[in-house]
Amino acid sequence: MARIGDGGDLLKCSFCGKSQKQVKKLIAGPGVYICDECIDLCNEIIEEELADADDVKLDELPKPVEIREFLEGYVIGQDTAKRTLAVAVYNHYKRIQAGEKSRDSRCEAVELTKSNILMLGPTGCGKTYLAQTLAKMLNVPFAIADATALTEAGYVGEDVENILLKLIQAADYDVKRAETGIIYIDEVDKIARKSENPSITRDVSGEGVQQALLKILEGTQASVPPQGGRKHPHQEFIQIDTTNVLFIVAGAFAGLEKIIYERVGKRGLGFGAEVRSKAEIDTTDHFAEVMPEDLIKFGLIPEFIGRLPVVASVTNLDKESLVKILSEPKNALVKQYTRLFEMDGVELEFTDDALEAIADQAIHRGTGARGLRAIMEEVLLPVMYDIPSRDDVAKVVVTKETVQDNVLPTIVPRKPSRSERRDKSA
């Protein structure tokens, strides 16, 4: 047992040799002692090793082709958006690693600035789902925020720093990991200012929020309230550097296509000019021709657009794509509902024309892929109510008439077993 002096009254740390008077705390074990300073040192060593293990290694990071292939398994269509996201994420971590190498070598190197992403496209076409699916693949902190809840500092609503808090929480409050994470800001079109011209009055949920987002998009040392909510002077803040945080902002931008058409339509003037009808533009990807001036006219400020150099657009989903979404992805809706019915011992089947009818309804409602689940819930509600209470059903078949004419699905009765037939005859 570690003791000091002839009397052996003072105990000492078995690792550093300091006496109990030289340290704040001495913890005893079976025949050994350890002081608080040695415990702190051990914790630091463990944290450093864990941090090194969590760092994204370039050779371990999926290549753009691999990222796109993973997205293909869950998201139908939107090939351009998949490629853009895959390249942006890969380059984001290459840039971070290049910065770390230049700091280690202490030599003058080319500074690589980040390229945040703006995603445009109609509602229900997969913008949010693409980001959520991407999060499954990457071992990095990932947070999704809603721009509609944000207001300028000092007004009722959420500060922009609360977006960073979600990222810190996703990293289990490991600020170092959070500083290399990804933030997806949805509904960014809702913070467009109310008119193209700068307003004299304050626009606290529009232009004011855009101004507040500028610094964290570009890269700054932000102070984040650890419990969220508004800042007040009598609280400690979490400091986070957003220089290496990749931002993906997205919105439906309803009405932007008209602005694009007005600009593109002006090309059809004079002899030999190519004249395209509005229908021709609308049937293709009208967001593919977006220019910064279109976004400014929509209501985004030039400084905000300048911090989003990469623009990716998603297109309206046609009938064929919606049918594929229903049945082909790994977690397709048909597979999900089939599994639900299997748990009750019943087989579920959709005919091909039933899937087409569901896709037609989604197009008619204008809800895109997001509306498919609601339609299927309506179609299956009667049988999902009855089936759990019945033991005579083997199969449920959903047809085109079930979807279009509110006809009940076809019920295929279960054949009684030999013992049941014997009991019945007895």
UniProtKB/Swiss-Prot annotation:
GO cellular component terms attached to this protein's record: HslUV protease complex
GO biological process per UniProt: cell division; proteolysis involved in protein catabolic process
InterPro entries reported in the protein's UniProt record: AAA+_ATPase, ATP-dep_Clp_protease_ClpX, ATPase_AAA_core, Clp_ATPase_C, Clp_protease_ATP-bd_su_ClpX, ClpX_bact, P-loop_NTPase, Znf_CppX_C4
UniProt: Zn(2+) binding residues: C13, C16, C35, C38
Entry annotated with the keyword Electron transport: no
Highest taxon of the lineage: Bacteria
Gene3D superfamilies: 1.10.8.60, ClpX chaperone, C4-type zinc finger domain, P-loop containing nucleotide triphosphate hydrolases
Endpoints of the signal sequence: none
GO molecular function, one term: unfolded protein binding
Keyword Iron among record annotations: no
Alphabetized UniProt keyword annotations: ATP-binding, Chaperone, Metal-binding, Nucleotide-binding, Zinc
Function: ATP-dependent specificity component of the Clp protease. It directs the protease to specific substrates. Can perform chaperone functions in the absence of ClpP.
PANTHER family according to UniProt: ATP-DEPENDENT CLP PROTEASE ATP-BINDING SUBUNIT CLPX-LIKE, MITOCHONDRIAL, ATP-DEPENDENT CLP PROTEASE ATP-BINDING SUBUNIT CLPX-LIKE, MITOCHONDRIAL-RELATED
Quaternary structure and interacting proteins, as annotated: Component of the ClpX-ClpP complex. Forms a hexameric ring that, in the presence of ATP, binds to fourteen ClpP subunits assembled into a disk-like structure with a central cavity, resembling the structure of eukaryotic proteasomes.
Protein's name in the database: ATP-dependent Clp protease ATP-binding subunit ClpX
Native organism: Mycobacterium marinum (strain ATCC BAA-535 / M)
